[in-house]
């Protein structure tokens, strides 16, 4: 037995901030940003909370997978920008989508969070503890980044993606993960609280 993704969903806010918009507030331009990042625009949440975006992505993933929220055993939410210290975002999503039988917790691993959450789902399912896991990656980094820092404000936007992971005979062949914390100081984002 292994695991496979049986449904995916996403949500992005309506507001778009282009590179030209950023050029009005920091010393930069479209060519500078694109040549270094490949980014032309990013989405910014104005009214959406992190958990609301995550819940909408989750609903879309469940719909595609044709799985009812009550069938979800575990919700893993990868985020670096939770709405609150507690409750965790996964529990907020659980309530919003009606996944009344699911446990839930957050994973904080920055850009790699979704991959860590997928691996965690894989391990739980392979162990036989859970059969259906909802994995979500969601962030509202626009509320945390320094909009006067050209080196970071050009990189981040807001949005959510979700995947329904289930036990399967064919799917994931193997997983190998490692970390290298030596470059941790290269890109940082502090708390606003």
What are these regions (language model features)?
Residues 1-47, 149-193:
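Condensing-enzyme catalytic core mediating Claisen C-C bond formation in acyl metabolism
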Residues 57-73:
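Phosphate/pyrophosphate-binding loops at sites that engage ATP/ADP/AMP, CoA/4′-phosphopantetheine
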Residues 11, 78-83, 109-114, 137-142, ...:
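Acidic, glycine-rich active-site loops and adjacent beta-strand->loop/helix elements
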Residues 4, 73-76, 134, 173:
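Conserved beta-strand elements of the Class I
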Residues 126-160:
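Flexible, glycine-rich active-site loops centered on histidine and acidic residues
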């Amino acid at each position: 037995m292994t695991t496979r993704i049986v449904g995916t969903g996403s949500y992005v806010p309506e507001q778009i901030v282009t590179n030209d918009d950023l050029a009005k507030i920091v010393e930069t331009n479209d060519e500078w940003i694109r040549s270094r990042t490949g980014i032309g625009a990013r989405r910014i949440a104005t009214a959406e909370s992190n958990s609301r975006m995550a819940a909408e992505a989750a609903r879309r993933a469940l719909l595609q997978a044709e799985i009812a929220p009550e069938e979800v055993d575990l919700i893993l939410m990868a985020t670096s920008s939770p709405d609150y210290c507690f409750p965790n975002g996964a529990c907020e999503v659980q309530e919003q989508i009606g996944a009344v039988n699911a446990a839930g917790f957050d994973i904080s691993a920055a850009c790699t969070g979704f991959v860590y959450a997928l691996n965690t789902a894989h391990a739980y399912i392979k162990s036989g503890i859970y059969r259906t896991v909802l994995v979500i990656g969601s962030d509202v980094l626009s509320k945390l980044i320094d909009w006067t820092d050209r080196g970071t404000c050009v990189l981040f936007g807001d949005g959510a993606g979700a995947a329904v992971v289930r036990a399967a005979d064919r799917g994931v062949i193997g997983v190998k993960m490692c970390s290298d914390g030596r470059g941790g100081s290269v890109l940082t984002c502090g708390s606003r609280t």
